[in-house]
């Protein structure tokens, strides 16, 4: 049975949970998803527990149903490859701060200069404006800053074992 997103091509520049989970859900629905890692592989590949194959179990779960490649989008050859990939893609998924998107050529203006109807979906811990917009944040940071840890800890604040913020943001 064909998925509802069959024929849709997605470039996944997501890291850790929110981006990869979002792209993984789209892959589950039939989209062709290409996970693009930095040369040498993404740092989220090695989050424990590590499988016998050397990959983190979470990395394998987040990247199921995807193809993968490595790319340096800041090198001349990498920029050319990225341009060709964007020309053939429908959606780009990334969860990086705005400055990182711009430096990699993954910001909306750069992408639409290549393909006018490309869809860019991004998520960041602190949004694109404001004093924390360029900071990187993970689920435990959001839990702590929002007060959630105070609700789950007794007597001291405690992080929830599940990364609720990341998973809910991705969906």
Enumerate the language-model features and the residues they cover.
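N-terminal helix-loop segment corresponding to the beta1-alpha1 unit
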Residues: 1-171
């Amino acid at each position: 049975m064909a998925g509802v997103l069959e024929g849709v091509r997605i470039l996944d520049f997501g890291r850790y949970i929110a981006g990869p989970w979002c792209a993984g859900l789209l892959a589950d629905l039939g989209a062709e998803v290409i996970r693009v890692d930095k040369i040498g592989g993404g740092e989220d590949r090695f989050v424990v527990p590590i499988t016998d194959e050397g990959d983190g179990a979470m990395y394998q779960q987040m990247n199921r149903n995807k193809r993968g490649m490595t790319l340096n989008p800041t090198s001349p050859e990498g920029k050319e490859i990225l341009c060709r990939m964007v020309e053939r893609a429908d959606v780009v998924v990334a969860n990086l701060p705005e400055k990182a998107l711009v430096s990699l050529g993954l910001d909306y203006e750069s992408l639409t200069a290549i393909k006018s109807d490309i869809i860019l979906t991004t998520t960041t811990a602190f949004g694109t404006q404001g004093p924390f917009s360029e900071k990187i944040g993970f689920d435990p940071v959001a839990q702590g800053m929002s007060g959630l840890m105070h609700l789950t800890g007794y007597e001291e604040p405690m992080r929830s074992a599940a990364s609720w913020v990341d998973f809910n943001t991705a969906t």
